[in-house]
């Protein structure tokens, strides 16, 4: 029984809550996570489908040659980058249920239209605008999660969301296999064209579901499934936030002057690159180069990396929320260790295949950083909703900008199978992630200390003012005694801040009688 209680305390997201809050949290989880996770799943299903379509007949049908697939993916990434800041601004002004649903419908329609393309140029144009519509999904979801969940609840939900995208990556290959075997040639369409039709159709019911049932944010929610008591509790249970204001030029200047935007963007830029072994398909390229493995093995074995990513993401999310004080920096050390071990084994190269498999599979653990770092960004910027929205989108945008030039330089296909340059870079990247996580942690602690000092000073000032008021009441209006007040210096000290208050009052005129 004690073991079951311990497991429940560790893994249950509702352990220790009263019935009212537990019921509220179950509703939030269902209506937010169900929509966001399915959306992200389809998002990654679509991203992976372009590569599967290429291998399943699209190359021949569109007469693709050279690096045209890479060019299509670069165009997609450019659209994704361009869509970040408009998406951030829109979610500050437009209800999330409207923005997400409209973007998903546009994205779904353009995915369906992809079945009709007959040139690479037409496909590039569609992929560009699909990426713009898709750009709000990832960072926008992290922004919404940060609006609904406490610091101790957030990372678990972010982990589930991140894992859903990884599952979409795994599922894409299986879906393409099923579609190609059952629909290829039906209606005069190739299997890859049917894949785009199916991917697009999946988004339409999801968009309608979000339009009517997604709850927006606690302060403005009109979701019919929340009672009035639950609506009030949904924002009262969270730390107090300043009233939401428009994103003005002054607000942008304040955000740019803060360390947060730079520290968190640098952290995610390099943390995203720790996923290089998986993202750049190094394992599949080695397996194909070695001529030891069948086509099925080359397609299926690398999915273990993604499976490891799912497990490590969920595990890191649970642990992060359960650690006392919810520290996030230890995961910088974790990513540094994983990248160092994997890169060192692969740089050595002349090791048994089993060691190579271990290095490739272990690299899947680097996916764990995504949920942890975006939860951390929400925690750090919780006191400024404008900054929080801008920072989570900029983190995602900056990482994509970095990756668009980093990957071709560090992991070109000509370096197959060893990728020595990229793996040396991976060692450096792991170290930068650890150092930057420590710096961000230090700055967060410093901010909390200053904020606590200011609050202590305010509390003291309130008490001091109340004491003065009581003293004046005691004196009374008709008190004929003179009030001689000498300099009264009140000094309080707290970590990082010293506040001194000096009160000086002139003596009243005294009677002339001796």
Curated annotation (Swiss-Prot):
Spans traversing the lipid bilayer: 24-44, 72-92, 98-118, 128-148, 159-179, 194-214, 263-283, 300-320, 329-349, 357-377, 390-410, 423-443
Key words of the record: Cell membrane, Membrane, Transmembrane, Transmembrane helix, Transport
CDD domains from the UniProt entry: MFS_FEN2_like (cd17327)
Family matches, as InterPro entries: MFS (IPR011701), MFS_dom (IPR020846), MFS_trans_sf (IPR036259)
Gene Ontology biological-process entries: pantothenate import across plasma membrane
Subcellular location: Cell membrane
GO MF, one example: pantothenate transmembrane transporter activity
Pfam families (alphabetical): MFS_1
Gene Ontology cellular component list: Golgi apparatus; plasma membrane
Membrane topology: Multi-pass membrane protein
Superkingdom of the source species: Eukaryota
PANTHER family: PANTOTHENATE TRANSPORTER FEN2 (PTHR43791:SF4), PERMEASE-RELATED (PTHR43791)
Family to which this protein belongs: Belongs to the major facilitator superfamily. Allantoate permease family.
Protein function: Transports pantothenate into the cell.
Name the UniProt record assigns to this protein: Pantothenate transporter liz1
């Amino acid at each position: 029984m004690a073991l079951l209680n311990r497991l429940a305390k560790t893994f249950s997201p509702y352990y220790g809550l009263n019935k009212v809050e537990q019921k509220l949290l179950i509703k939030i989880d269902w209506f937010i996570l169900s929509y966001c996770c399915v959306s992200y799943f389809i998002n990654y299903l679509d991203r992976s489908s372009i590569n599967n379509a290429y291998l399943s007949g699209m190359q021949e049908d569109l007469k693709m040659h050279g690096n045209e697939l890479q060019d299509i993916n670069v165009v997609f990434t450019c659209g994704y980058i361009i869509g970040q800041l408009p998406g951030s601004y829109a979610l500050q002004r437009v209800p999330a249920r409207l923005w997400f649903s409209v973007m998903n419908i546009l994205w779904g329609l353009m995915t369906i239209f992809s079945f009709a393309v007959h040139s690479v140029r037409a496909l590039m144009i569609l992929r560009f605008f699909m990426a713009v519509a898709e750009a709000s999904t990832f960072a926008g979801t992290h922004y919404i999660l940060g609006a609904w969940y406490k610091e101790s609840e957030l990372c678990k939900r972010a982990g589930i969301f991140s894992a859903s995208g990884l599952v979409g990556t795994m599922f894409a290959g299986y879906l393409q296999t099923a579609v190609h075997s059952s629909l290829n040639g039906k209606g005069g369409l190739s299997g890859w064209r049917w894949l785009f039709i199916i991917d697009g159709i999946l988004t339409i019911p999801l968009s309608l579901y979000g339009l009517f049932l997604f709850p927006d944010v606690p302060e403005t929610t009109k979701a019919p499934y929340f009672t009035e008591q639950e609506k009030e509790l949904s924002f009262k249970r969270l730390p107090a936030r300043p009233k939401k204001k428009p994103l003005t030029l002054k607000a942008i200047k304040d955000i740019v002057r803060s360390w947060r935007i730079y520290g968190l963007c640098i952290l995610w830029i390099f943390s995203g690159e720790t996923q290089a072994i998986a993202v750049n398909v190094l394992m599949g390229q080695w397996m194909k180069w070695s001529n030891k493995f069948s086509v099925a093995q080359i397609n299926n074995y690398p999915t273990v990396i993604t499976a490891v990513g799912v497990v490590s993401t969920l595990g890191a999310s649970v642990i992060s929320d359960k650690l006392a004080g919810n520290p996030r920096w230890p995961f910088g050390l974790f990513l540094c260790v994983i990248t160092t071990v994997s890169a060192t084994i692969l740089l050595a190269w002349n090791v048994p295949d089993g060691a190579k498999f271990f290095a490739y599979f272990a690299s899947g653990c680097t996916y764990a950083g995504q949920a942890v770092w975006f939860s951390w960004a929400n925690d750090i910027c919780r006191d400024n909703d404008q900054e929080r929205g801008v920072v989570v989108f900029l983190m995602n945008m900056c990482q994509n900008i970095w990756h668009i030039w980093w990957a071709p330089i560090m992991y070109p296909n000509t370096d197959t199978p060893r990728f020595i340059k990229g793996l040396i870079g991976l060692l450096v990247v792991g170290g930068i992630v650890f150092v930057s996580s420590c710096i961000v942690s230090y700055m967060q602690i410093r901010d909390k200390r200053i904020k606590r000092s200011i609050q202590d000073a305010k509390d003291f000032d309130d008490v001091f003012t109340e004491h003065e008021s009581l003293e004046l009441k005691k004196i009374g209006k008709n008190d004929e005694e003179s009030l001689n007040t000498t300099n009264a210096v009140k000094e309080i000290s707290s970590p990082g801040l010293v506040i001194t208050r000096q009160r000086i009052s002139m003596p009243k005129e005294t009677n002339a009688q001796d």
